[in-house]
C-alpha cells in the first residue's frame, strides 16, 4: 500500500481530485488531499498570504504530522508544483517521489523558487485578482 498526497493547482481545491482519490483508494492505497491556504474549503483570506510558506502551510503541516517512517508519493498539479517543491526541500525524508502533472517543477540546480525570484509578488497579485473573477 502506498500513500499519496494530492496537491491542487491555482484557483482550485482538494475537490479537484474527487475522481482520482476513490480510484487510488479502491486499489488499496491511502490518499490525502490538501486544501492549500485560501483555497477550497480553507477559510483563510488570500490577502493573508505573504510568502510561499504561508500558501503551502496546510501541506507542510500534513507532512509534518506523518511519522518519520512514513514516505509519501507527492502529486502536484499546475501551481501546486511550487508548494510541492518547497515541501520536498523541507521534508526530503518523508517523500519517496514527487510527481508533477502539467506543473511548475523545480530544477536540480536552482532553488525551488528561482523562476519566481523577481516576480513572486506579481504572481500573488495575479492570483488575488484572478480569484475575484472566478465564479464557480
UniProtKB/Swiss-Prot annotation:
- The identity of this protein, by name, is Putative inactive methylesterase 20
* Family annotation (Pfam families): Abhydrolase_6
Any one GO biological process: embryo development ending in seed dormancy
Task: Report the family membership.
Answer: Belongs to the AB hydrolase superfamily. Methylesterase family.
Recorded name of the encoding gene: MES20
User: What Gene3D superfamilies does the database record attribute to this sequence?
Assistant: alpha/beta hydrolase
Q: What are the AB hydrolase-1 domain coordinates in residue numbering? A: 5-108
Q: Which UniProt keywords apply?
A: Hydrolase
Q: Which GO terms describe its molecular function?
A: hydrolase activity
